[in-house]
Regions:
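C-terminal alpha-helical "lid" subdomain
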Residues: 2-21, 44, 48-53, 172, ...
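A structured, charge-rich N-terminal accessory region that forms the first stable segment of a protein
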Residues: 3, 25-30
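Pre-Walker A (Motif I) flank of P-loop NTPase domains
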Residues: 30-37, 59
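Sensor-1/coupling segment of RecA-like P-loop NTPase cores
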Residues: 37-43, 130-154
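Short, well-ordered alpha-helices that flank and scaffold nucleotide-derived cofactor binding pockets
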Residues: 52-56, 80, 129
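A short helix-turn-beta junction within AAA+ P-loop NTPase domains corresponding to the substrate/partner-engaging
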Residues: 59-60, 151-168
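AAA+/P-loop NTPase substrate/partner-engagement loops
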Residues: 61-82
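Mid-core helix/loop region of P-loop NTP-binding domains shared across ATPases and GTPases
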Residues: 70, 76, 85-137, 149, ...
Length: 256
């Protein structure tokens, strides 16, 4: 086992496969103006991680909105991402951005998309203007209620060709993550326990794997099972202020 905790690797989960399938459908759309798609779900399911990894792999433009966004601010962020001169009035900046985006058909990803809906969705309307003219794909990432919020803006909602809801990770997803990311072998029972304790929250899974690795390293274990982690907290439930602990089933191992 190496000195570094947990391998740095991208795990292609069921949510990833649904997302990629939806992107392909939007790219092959019939109506050029219907070039937007929405990704939503509760926190911790890997929305930002999956889509940002896809963006890095495909050359898409990845932006993260914030509560201060205005149409001009959005254009400035887009210019910075493309390393384009962001000076001048909004009209000239819009034109400078439109040309390369249209020519290269770069998708635009906007994380924390709720913030684009302020002031009658003024910032998102500006992005929509670009998408309408460039005929490129725009991917919005938001929380569970964003779908209903966007419905209030017909000019935007009518352009959303696909909606992808991210769901809790499956047992197969967790098994893949444990096998690909951990530098120690885990028993099937332990991977099932991690799935149960995490409730399919991939963020929790990623927090638990290093704990398993530390126990394995401290106790020189080639393969870790449920009994090796009995009573050991793998994470912490901050809402209930209680540790998330492997079920008791035998002797405890030492924790580094």
């Amino acid at each position: 086992m190496g000195e570094e905790d947990m391998r740095k690797m991208f795990v292609k989960t069921e949510n990833y496969r649904k997302f990629v399938s939806a992107v392909k459908a939007v790219e092959q759309r019939g109506a050029a103006e219907a070039g937007m798609m929405l990704v939503y779900g509760v926190p911790g399911l890997g929305k930002s991680h999956i889509v940002s990894s896809w963006a890095a792999e495909t050359g898409a433009i990845f932006l993260r909105a914030n509560k201060d966004w205005t149409p001009r601010y959005a254009l400035s962020e887009l210019a910075a991402a493309l390393e384009i001169d962001g000076r001048g009035n909004s009209q000239k900046l819009f034109a400078r951005l439109l040309k390369p985006i249209a020519a290269n058909q770069w998708p635009i990803v906007i994380d924390e998309a709720e913030f684009t809906l302020a002031n009658q969705a003024a910032s998102l309307e500006k992005i929509r203007d670009i998408s309408d003219r460039a005929e490129n794909t725009v991917i919005l990432i938001g929380m569970g209620n964003i779908q209903n919020d966007i419905k209030r803006y017909g000019q935007i909602s009518s352009r959303i060709a696909r909606v992808v809801e991210f769901l809790p990770a499956t047992l197969e997803d967790v098994q893949s993550a444990c096998k690909q990311l951990a530098e120690v072998e885990m028993s099937p029972e332990l991977m099932a326990e991690i799935h149960r304790l995490s409730r399919g929250c991939m963020r929790e899974v990623l927090n638990m794997v290093p704990v398993v690795e530390r126990v394995a390293k401290t106790n020189r274990l080639a393969c870790v099972g449920v009994d090796d982690l009995a009573g050991i907290p793998l994470s912490h439930d901050w809402q209930n202020r209680t540790p998330v602990t492997v079920k008791q089933s035998g002797g405890k191992r030492k924790v580094a």
